[in-house]
Amino acid sequence: KKAADTLLDMLRENGASLFIFPQHKDEIIDILRNFRDRDAYDAKPSQPLERLEAEQFTTIEIDQEIQSLTSSLKSLGIAEAPRESYLDEIGSLKKNPAAYINYSGLSDHVLKNIPRYSRSNQMLQNDIDAISYIILQRDGMRYETIESCQSIFLTTNYSLVREANQFLRYSAYKMQISPIISDIDLTSILWIKYAMQNNNIPRLWLISAANAAVSPTA
């Protein structure tokens, strides 16, 4: 949590606008509901939520979390992302071919290489929609600096970052800001650029990375 708070603080301090995709907000609500309705004796428990487990949240308290999600996000300065149009300012279809990704190709690639997406077609569609939105908002342009980049899809899904950027031909060895980026990579960029005086950041991310290694995702 401290690492995430640090990242959000750096983004705000450097003028970033923070948004959540509506479909991902719905996913959060579904996760909370599944956790609320979980069967304690089920051999296959629902997705664990550390804070709720540790604090032993009741059903009523989880319902309150769901009801207050919008205001909680707002308190963090996170708004719901507006819909991106395929039309330009004068009502014409955006002409840059690079603004349109191979949607089915990317979906197939991600599904093939990240097994857990086979369990939820909706989750796959949500993430591919988000990537498509970002590239469309960028009008297919590639950026070399974080300041010039119009939008980024920030996620802790490191497998998705790897596979999507591989399919979209964003090499880790090129100085380009990819449309989808991990929280660790973005924090590293911001720390190097703006916050090297905060020597606590690397330690926070080492802790975060260690926690992720204990429970890796496919």
Protein language model features and the residues they cover:
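Active-site-proximal, substrate-binding regions of enzyme catalytic domains
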Residues: 2-151, 159-218
